[in-house]
Amino acid sequence: QGSKRGKMQMEVVSNLLQAAVTLLGFFLGGIRYLKSRKQEYFLLTCFYGCFFLGSLYWTLYLLLFSETPQVFYVSEFGWIASVIFLYLLQYTLSSAEERDFSTRKSLIAPLIGIPLCVFYCTFGDVLSNLLWCGMMIVVSYHSIRGLAYAQIQTGTACKMRYFHIGVLCYVAVEYALWLSGCLWPGYSISNPYCWFDLLLTGCLFALLPATGKAVQT
């Protein structure tokens, strides 16, 4: 019982940290939007806000009932909405030339995402996994293409690579988080899931300065 309580406390602390970081991102993004009135910062603020709401529900449920939410779709609505805003941010930041740019490297996204999706579906809800992996494939496809395009640019245009790297890190850690959750269920300091969850928090916050650099292009 004590071990279970300790694991629950660790998960609560990790989720509180994630909620705090995304709330901070929401306020900082909002301040930047109010100062500049740039659509990119509005979309970034929405990304953080939706992610925060999903994390907040999950954390409050843990605190009140000492177990993970049984109806996880409530949190997923917020998290899914955040990825949609992330994609819209991707599209807004990209130029017409970047969107028309073609590279075979982009195929890495479905080549990795589809097998992982099949694997995840054997452990959890099929519809949820199809939706999540589909979105991850889309945003990673565009970021791989954008990164390849940024590598051949000069001047301020090459700063877009920081944003694309940030998105790819976010996607990679999400994949690793889900994979560790399938292979090593539970939440403890020795579980890779715990460390990937903390790493995800760092990736989320890193998107703020990465977007700032991209907006300057």
What spans do the regions from the language model cover?
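Internal transmembrane alpha-helix with an interfacial aromatic "cap," most often the third helix
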Residues: 25-36, 59-108, 144-150, 208-215
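Hydrophobic alpha-helical transmembrane segments of multi-pass membrane proteins
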Residues: 17-29, 41-64, 75-85, 161-183, ...
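Membrane-interfacial loop-to-transmembrane alpha-helix junctions, especially the N-terminal start
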Residues: 36-49, 98-109, 154-167, 216-217
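Cytosolic, intrinsically disordered low-complexity tails and loops
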Residues: 1-4, 217
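Membrane-interface helix caps and helix-loop-helix hairpins in membrane proteins
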Residues: 64-70, 119-130, 184-187
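Hydrophobic, aromatic-enriched interface-forming segments
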Residues: 106-145
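Hydrophobic transmembrane alpha-helical segments in integral membrane proteins
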Residues: 4-24, 124-133
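C-terminal transmembrane-bundle signature of multipass membrane proteins
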Residues: 141-217
